[in-house]
């Protein structure tokens, strides 16, 4: 096997790795649930209070204890809980204040392939300050890769809809998100005009035990802690499509995606901004970038996998960067191949952030090429959520070059790092699988490279 190596010219660390995508679908006929301050209706009739019905309403008192001591800080809040107890598709619209959508199909649901619920959010606005706003407690598991498309918990964003979820967290580990699921969860959008979901969380944004699959939709997550949290070592978080922007760690700690298992980025756009204490992306069993556009800004990501499919650039800066300037990557001729303007990303509006590491990947990157990184300046063209459509960018000017790198062939036995015109041969260290170790100046010791397929 052959390797390629970067030749950086500043103290930023580059990592090239060979780190594929589905969309949403049309929904079946659905039971309509109308939400309002004047009451909840199901198919035009007032919602039932009978637990034997497929959809019913209860009022529950939730104890909140901010200090965990049961003292004067404790309070009780009454919450409206809309229970869904039968498989099917449910279309929600309107506003639910201090309420929760709870899906529980019973103890045997986990192994019942018919125990599937799809919530279509059709201009729905859900708010709960003391618990998850959406809670999938018991549905079909469907956690294996083969059954990912047949997951029991599904959220579908209605065509052209604008939806908001503002939620808290529960007492259980699996219920720490504004949207929480004890089983696997799929999120997508109806076709044609993409639906939007803006999610705000006082803890985790989305918390799933087994498998989270995002297939489509415009999704914006603002979270005090992690944007997406997966608790199990065999869990999988996967993005196949859609436009996902995450601002995490707003409370100081937390990453954009934190999974004990695998993180698979296979399509769509993912913009991830984390806090300054935890990795912006972390996969206990690997972070795989296989397709799409990925920008991760914050503390260095953890678990980047070498046996992935898309060329990825990782940079670690010697000093903090304020997240305000356009980030541009050009080719050797200084033609822009990637551009992102955080000032145009609505999820970062009014939220000053810093970063010490950046991970960038897009389909335009290829092996054996030279790239330049710029911060600042102005790109002429159209962008969506700060990400530029490179086919429409006509010019770029005014930026400050941070570094450039060149890939060239190198064999497994070692090689040289070209830095400030000097050559240095690695010695006395083991060569990690799929990577060659290099030294960058006197401060940095890191791995970077890309393996030929």
Regions found by a protein language model. Name each.
Residues 1-10:
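Bacterial N-terminal signal peptides that target proteins for export
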Residues 17-21:
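C-terminal motif of bacterial Sec signal peptides marking the signal peptidase cleavage site
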Residues 22-453:
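A composition-driven surface/loop motif
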